[in-house]
Amino acid sequence: MRKRKTLDQLTLMDDYMFYQVMKDPGRMRRVLEWILNITITKLEYVVAQKTEKEGYDSKAIRLDLYVTDDRGNIYNVEVQSYKEDSLPKRIRYYQSVIDVDILTPGAKYEKLKKSYVVFFYNYDPFERNRYIYTFENRCLE
C-alpha cells in the first residue's frame, strides 16, 4: 500500500493540488491560452474528475479537468505522473468520447465545437527533449 502524502508533499502533479490551483477560471484560462497559443474570452465551467461512459459495454474515462468556454469549446486537462506507452491512442479515445457526448441524436456534425486534450507530464513522453507536443487531426493530401 502506498503511503499517503502530506499536504506539504503535494505538487501540481497530484490530482488534488492540480485541481486546487487550476479550478480558478482566470488562472486556467491563462494556462490554456499560453499552451494552445489561442485567445479565450471567458471560461464558463471547470469541473474535476468528470466521468464519461457512452455505452453499457464501453470503457469509461475520468477527465481530470473538464472545461468549457463561452463559445462552447471544450478543454480536457489531464495530469499524468507515470509513464504510459499508448499516449496517442489514449488521447484519441478521450477526444472521441468527448465528441460523442456533445451531439444529441439527429444533430448535425457542424454542431461539434472545437475540443482540446491537454496532458501535463513530469517526464518527456516521447524522449525528444521538448516540453510541448502538438497533435492535429487533419488530412495530409
What are these regions (language model features)?
Residues 1-141:
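Elongated, amphipathic alpha-helical interaction scaffolds
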